[in-house]
């Protein structure tokens, strides 16, 4: 099972990724983790990436694809792998295709923007303990106060409505076109093209998991 997981921020990709990983016995490959590991290990690509990052630059797609290819050589990838948060852009998808990285499925978890905004902007946190609440789905006993200490809850900057909307704009501009990219490739009849599946990310977690497993048959 070689898979790319797509979906907007707040769609529940992380939760579903854990279930998919467990079911198929495959590692979740995050480019952020890969970069940190390569830098720490001091691999040639890691050294190159560190130079760019230390200078405040963005690591090139070429370096990222090199890291991906190295990572896929590791033993835990023999039964497959799952990409989460990569590729993010069409040039990255092209680079992966050119590098011959095999993909069986592209699974999109679809959630309307209005639902994402409600999910994320409703989050509240008690910073000292890390306890989290949601104004609609998991409200504190007293509005705006932590259940245990009675201290104030805060809305993290990441969860503010305008921030969430900006992140969604970036997703729609850069990452959502990947669905069309992979669908067109699949429609071309190329045997190497992945199967593209879309499921709804609305409902209970176990319902979404059942949809995901069903789509990956």
UniProtKB/Swiss-Prot annotation:
Pfam family, one: ADK
InterPro entries for this protein: Adenyl_kin_sub (IPR006259), Adenylat/UMP-CMP_kin (IPR000850), Adenylat_kinase_CS (IPR033690), Adenylate_kinase_lid-dom (IPR007862), P-loop_NTPase (IPR027417)
Keyword Ligase: no
Subcellular location: Cytoplasm
EC number: 2.7.4.3
Region described as LID: spans on this chain: 122-159
Region annotation NMP: where it falls in the sequence: 30-59
Reactions that this protein is recorded to catalyse: AMP + ATP = 2 ADP
Binding site for AMP: 31, 36, 57-59, 85-88, 92, 156, 167
Keywords: ATP-binding, Cytoplasm, Kinase, Nucleotide biosynthesis, Nucleotide-binding, Transferase
Annotated Gene Ontology cellular component terms: cytoplasm
Gene3D superfamilies (alphabetical): P-loop containing nucleotide triphosphate hydrolases
MF annotations from Gene Ontology: adenylate kinase activity; ATP binding
Key word Repeat present: no
Listed GO biological process terms: AMP salvage
Pathway field: Purine metabolism; AMP biosynthesis via salvage pathway; AMP from ADP: step 1/1
Protein residues bound to ATP: 10-15, 123, 132-133, 203
Function: Catalyzes the reversible transfer of the terminal phosphate group between ATP and AMP. Plays an important role in cellular energy homeostasis and in adenine nucleotide metabolism.
Domain notes: Consists of three domains, a large central CORE domain and two small peripheral domains, NMPbind and LID, which undergo movements during catalysis. The LID domain closes over the site of phosphoryl transfer upon ATP binding. Assembling and dissambling the active center during each catalytic cycle provides an effective means to prevent ATP hydrolysis.
Family assignment from sequence similarity: Belongs to the adenylate kinase family.
Subunit structure: Monomer.
Protein name, entry field: Adenylate kinase
């Amino acid at each position: 099972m070689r898979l790319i997981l797509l979906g907007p921020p707040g769609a529940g990709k992380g939760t579903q990724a854990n279930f998919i990983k467990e079911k198929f016995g495959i590692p979740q490959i995050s480019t952020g983790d890969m970069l940190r590991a390569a830098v720490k290990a001091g691999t040639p690509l890691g050294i190159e990436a560190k130079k760019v990052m230390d200078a405040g630059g963005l690591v090139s797609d070429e370096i990222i694809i090199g890291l991906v290819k190295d990572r896929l050589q590791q033993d835990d990838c023999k039964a497959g792998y799952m990409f989460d948060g990569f590729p993010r852009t069409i040039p990255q998808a092209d680079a992966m295709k050119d590098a011959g990285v095999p993909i069986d499925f592209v699974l999109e978890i679809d959630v309307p923007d209005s639902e994402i905004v409600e999910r994320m902007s409703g989050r509240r946190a008690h910073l000292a303990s890390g306890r989290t609440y949601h104004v609609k789905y998991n409200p504190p006993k007293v509005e705006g106060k932590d259940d245990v200490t009675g201290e104030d809850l805060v809305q993290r900057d990441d969860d503010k409505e305008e921030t969430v909307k900006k992140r969604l704009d970036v997703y729609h501009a850069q990452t959502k076109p990947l669905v069309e990219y992979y669908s067109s490739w699949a429609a071309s009849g190329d045997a190497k093209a992945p199967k593209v599946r879309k499921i709804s990310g609305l409902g209970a977690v176990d319902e979404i998991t059942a949809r995901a497993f069903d789509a990956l048959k």
